[in-house]
């Protein structure tokens, strides 16, 4: 009997196989899930032995909005044959930040409107923990007056450039009356001596807003008396928003000047009975 031998070498050099996991998209870097070997579900090998799946690394492309992270897993069979599969994780925030519109403001004059202030936007927030930038955009007037409405706009922008606009309504409406003093009184001997109305006698008109003030004659009203008669002369003082006051000037008509006449020529008569009767026509 003769024995012969055959050497059979078992040496698996075929790498295992597996599919790359599906791409994941998240809003924020904090939303990137932890590595999980269970996302590899179809690992296989030509030999029926245990296959080990392991996390290898996360590598970012260094970009932002979006940032792409390549996550690598190794697939190792019982003979140490290794395959690598990768999963793309895209970090891209497309969610708008939030902020509230500012409360309305009211001003008497356009000069009282406060300057823009980004610090008035106090509740800005975002789904991702990055810097939020608040900026003044512009003031737009409705072109009205008394009131005029100004819409002030601020932008709120997150780190990925997602932006919203918030507004503040500013109403400019002057409801404060102008001021002026009553002109000094006048005295006249006769009604015909009363001077004509003159708006320039009102000299100290003023208003809280720097716009033209109009003074106008309103009326002369007599008390109906005589010797003296009192006339109340009224002027109106009106600002640019139609706020109006009335000022008055008292004019007293009182004639205190004696009349004049010449003595009649002398008359000579011979007898007392010849003295003529009184005659006012002389």
Residue ranges, per PLM feature:
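Proline-threonine-serine-rich low-complexity tracts
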Residues: 1-282
């Amino acid at each position: 009997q003769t024995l012969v031998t055959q050497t059979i070498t078992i040496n698996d050099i075929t790498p295992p196989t597996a599919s790359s996991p599906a791409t994941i998209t998240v809003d924020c870097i904090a939303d990137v899930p932890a590595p999980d070997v269970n996302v590899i579900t179809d690992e296989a090998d030509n030999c029926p032995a245990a296959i080990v799946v392991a996390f290898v690394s996360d590598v970012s492309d260094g970009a932002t909005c979006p940032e792409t992270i390549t996550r690598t897993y190794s697939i190792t069979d019982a003979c140490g044959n290794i395959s690598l599969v990768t999963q793309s994780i895209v970090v891209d925030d497309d969610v708008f930040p939030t902020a509230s519109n500012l409360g309305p403001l009211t001003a008497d004059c356009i000069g009282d409107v406060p300057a823009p202030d980004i610090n008035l936007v106090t509740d800005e927030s975002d789904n991702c923990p990055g810097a939020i930038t608040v900026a003044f955009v512009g003031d737009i007037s409705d072109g009205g007056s008394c009131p005029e409405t100004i819409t002030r706009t601020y932008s709120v922008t997150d780190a990925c450039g997602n932006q919203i606009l918030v507004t503040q309504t500013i109403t400019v409406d002057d409801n404060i009356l102008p001021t002026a003093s009553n002109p000094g009184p006048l005295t006249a001997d006769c009604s015909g001596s009363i001077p004509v109305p003159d708006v320039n006698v009102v000299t100290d008109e003023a208003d809280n807003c720097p716009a033209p003030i109009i003074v106008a004659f309103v009326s002369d009203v007599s008390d109906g008396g005589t010797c003296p008669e009192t006339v109340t002369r009224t002027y109106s003082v009106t600002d640019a928003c139609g706020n109006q006051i009335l000022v008055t000037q008292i004019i007293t008509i009182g004639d205190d000047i004696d009349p004049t006449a010449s003595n009649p020529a002398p008359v000579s008569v011979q007898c007392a009975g010849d003295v003529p009767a009184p005659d006012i026509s002389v």
